[in-house]
Amino acid sequence: MAQLNQNFIDTITQELPAHLSMDDFIAACDRPLRRSIRVNTLKISADDFKTLMQPKGWTFDPIPWCKDGFWISYDEEEQLGNALEHIQGLFYIQEASSMLPPTALFTPSAFTPSAKWQCVLDLASAPGSKTTQIAALMHNSGLLIANEYSASRVKVLHANVLRMGASHCALTHFDGRVFGEYLYESFDAVLIDAPCGGEGTVRKDADALKHWSLNDVLAISETQKALIESAFLALKPGGSLVYSTCTLNRLENQGVCEYLKQTYGDAVQFESLSDLFEGAERATTPEGFLHVWPQIYDSEGFFVAKLTKTASVPRLQPEPTLQKNFPFTPATTKQAQGIKDYFQQDLGISLPDDLIMVRDDEFWLFPHEFRDFIGRMRFQRIGIKLADSTKHGFKVRHEAIIALAGKQLSPTAKTVDLSDVEAKEYLMGRDISLNTAVKAQGEVIVCYGGAPLGMAKHLGNRLKNNLPRDLVKDKVLLLSEQIKSL
């Protein structure tokens, strides 16, 4: 049972909309969340994913605000994170409400008729659900900078970006309050899913509100105000900003947005989200924000606001000096052609027309748009590592296969499709015996369900596993008999 602090109840009773009841709110807080996932369209379409999973007993209940999101039901004794298709990056386990902010950011409106952003900032990214959703909405084009303040969470973010095949990301590790200074008016769109009190998460954490206090809310709202101001300064004139939290009180939600409006006046134009999806008006505030109480859509509590920056505003700090000693250099024409030929001729992959960069013996692929950000900030990770140069040519990197060996594959690519049992063995680091001995084929891409798992060396009678050791799993779940129909 949810532990609802009486001070929280007293505060939220005053803020609950007139058409909602406190009894329904408390009852909703005690109900477990429906399980939800988002299909990763960077690797597979929603329709193809359904076709893949229906023989395994899956049924799909669509989430109205995310065309690739679905509620599912499964045996809760099993860890869905160990599922073969999850490890493969075909889907992300994501709470339905958290799919709202990217949808709001990329939905055209009266103020933003086109959502084809080239440079997007996700200011507080980890663990990566919204980052990878944005990457899918951008179709792995343009540049997505994903920032995370917590060092340990940067590692989780990086792992999820790689697993989902998001190739046009650059990761940073900074306090989000510096972006308005370092990358002033640089982004077409900014998402800030702000750190918050987490009041909306009580359905998955019964103790989330046990120690709630107004002083904590006031303190965190000051941080949120600084973050939204930094995000606004980093936004180009004419760009869109979405501010979201998984909390419910006005101080952390409407109060933060009102602070920005009071500070920058007419440069801040709120956009109504009442038409974002069918039924959105049930959660729309007078300002046009979405204030999602858990009983409205049987989901987590959430808040989403969207605004347009209608004019440039003065920067608060002088432009910082450009940093020197960037460790990457553009590949020479000969180097670039060599790596392109290797990918095309040996792997059957056509490299995208992006920046091929070199660091020592490493070849990397950067988004073209990253060129304008060189020297302006320190980055933890940029784009994808393609290959290492060796005495005998190149050795492809696993992350390049995961990101590029889907829609980029040519019909002549050397691939081997595995059964689910074989795919499980592969992900557990084991070699795969072949039923029929044939001529050895060298490096091949192993796939399951039409999406790549990694590389192997075809030795004629078996596939020698080339999965990086740090990605080998102790347990891989086959879902054939685990998912229950709704």
Swiss-Prot record:
<comment type="similarity">
    <text>Belongs to the class I-like SAM-binding methyltransferase superfamily. RsmB/NOP family.</text>
</comment>
<keyword id="KW-0698">rRNA processing</keyword>
<dbReference type="Pfam" id="PF21150">
    <property type="entry name" value="YebU_pre-PUA_dom"/>
</dbReference>
<keyword id="KW-0949">S-adenosyl-L-methionine</keyword>
<dbReference type="InterPro" id="IPR011023">
    <property type="entry name" value="Nop2p"/>
</dbReference>
<dbReference type="InterPro" id="IPR023545">
    <property type="entry name" value="rRNA_ssu_MeTfrase_F"/>
</dbReference>
<dbReference type="GO" id="GO:0070475">
    <property type="term" value="P:rRNA base methylation"/>
</dbReference>
<keyword id="KW-0694">RNA-binding</keyword>
<dbReference type="Pfam" id="PF13636">
    <property type="entry name" value="Methyltranf_PUA"/>
</dbReference>
<keyword id="KW-0808">Transferase</keyword>
<keyword id="KW-0489">Methyltransferase</keyword>
<feature type="binding site">
    <location>
        <position position="193"/>
    </location>
    <ligand>
        <name>S-adenosyl-L-methionine</name>
    </ligand>
</feature>
<dbReference type="InterPro" id="IPR049560">
    <property type="entry name" value="MeTrfase_RsmB-F_NOP2_cat"/>
</dbReference>
<dbReference type="GO" id="GO:0003723">
    <property type="term" value="F:RNA binding"/>
</dbReference>
<dbReference type="InterPro" id="IPR023267">
    <property type="entry name" value="RCMT"/>
</dbReference>
<dbReference type="GO" id="GO:0009383">
    <property type="term" value="F:rRNA (cytosine-C5-)-methyltransferase activity"/>
</dbReference>
<feature type="active site" description="Nucleophile">
    <location>
        <position position="246"/>
    </location>
</feature>
<keyword id="KW-0963">Cytoplasm</keyword>
<dbReference type="InterPro" id="IPR048457">
    <property type="entry name" value="YebU_pre-PUA_dom"/>
</dbReference>
<comment type="function">
    <text>Specifically methylates the cytosine at position 1407 (m5C1407) of 16S rRNA.</text>
</comment>
<protein>
    <recommendedName>
        <fullName>Ribosomal RNA small subunit methyltransferase F</fullName>
        <ecNumber>2.1.1.178</ecNumber>
    </recommendedName>
</protein>
<dbReference type="Pfam" id="PF01189">
    <property type="entry name" value="Methyltr_RsmB-F"/>
</dbReference>
<dbReference type="InterPro" id="IPR029063">
    <property type="entry name" value="SAM-dependent_MTases_sf"/>
</dbReference>
<dbReference type="InterPro" id="IPR001678">
    <property type="entry name" value="MeTrfase_RsmB-F_NOP2_dom"/>
</dbReference>
<dbReference type="InterPro" id="IPR031341">
    <property type="entry name" value="Methyltr_RsmF_N"/>
</dbReference>
<dbReference type="InterPro" id="IPR027391">
    <property type="entry name" value="Nol1_Nop2_Fmu_2"/>
</dbReference>
<dbReference type="Pfam" id="PF17125">
    <property type="entry name" value="Methyltr_RsmF_N"/>
</dbReference>
<feature type="binding site">
    <location>
        <begin position="124"/>
        <end position="130"/>
    </location>
    <ligand>
        <name>S-adenosyl-L-methionine</name>
    </ligand>
</feature>
<feature type="binding site">
    <location>
        <position position="175"/>
    </location>
    <ligand>
        <name>S-adenosyl-L-methionine</name>
    </ligand>
</feature>
<dbReference type="GO" id="GO:0005737">
    <property type="term" value="C:cytoplasm"/>
</dbReference>
<feature type="binding site">
    <location>
        <position position="148"/>
    </location>
    <ligand>
        <name>S-adenosyl-L-methionine</name>
    </ligand>
</feature>
